[in-house]
């Protein structure tokens, strides 16, 4: 049994909140750079160039990449041989978010209730997903989620008679309905299977997968590639002004489901699909 003090968790979450909001993962930066080179028309090429300049400026000036610093979504893999001491785990995660958004001078975007809309003033509470896994470590992934793209996401409960084409049509329809609202080029997270809630979780988790990494199961890998081709043929472009680059990647995650259902969820990420991770 290994003891981990909540102080380490607080510090790690604080650092990850700041890092995720100011430095985009290298693979996504590279993908945006490649997309800029592939654009041939003047306007989309200029826009993609401006996005790259913004990424560089955020890093150099130690500023957030985007003014919407998101709702803090935290994926926590907690080893079963870990004993957390000094306090409560979820309280520690939320304290880390509070410190990260306060000390990092990040916008506070969370309201305490959907109807009274009073700001909590420290971007808490976070959305926390915890799994108990083998081992004696804690892996934390912080994924701040802006709501320009979140608001464009959808879920549909298909029946088992739905075909692969039906599922792909749903993803494509979701992207077309979104248009330029999610600040394309987008990263498209897709979840198939599970139940109503788990399907949405899969789509969200898919956004944390590197954009250069395809699904290992051939049928889903082929769907990712075909969907990316179809989405980029829509000419929505960056940021809705036309062009070859509407999406940078389509990431699909799938899970077992009930014999009577086939849930499908699409969680859209903008070109600033942020995440940072650390293992304690």
What is the predicted function of each stretch?
Residues 1-190, 195-280:
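Non-transmembrane, aqueous-exposed alpha-helical and coiled segments at domain scale
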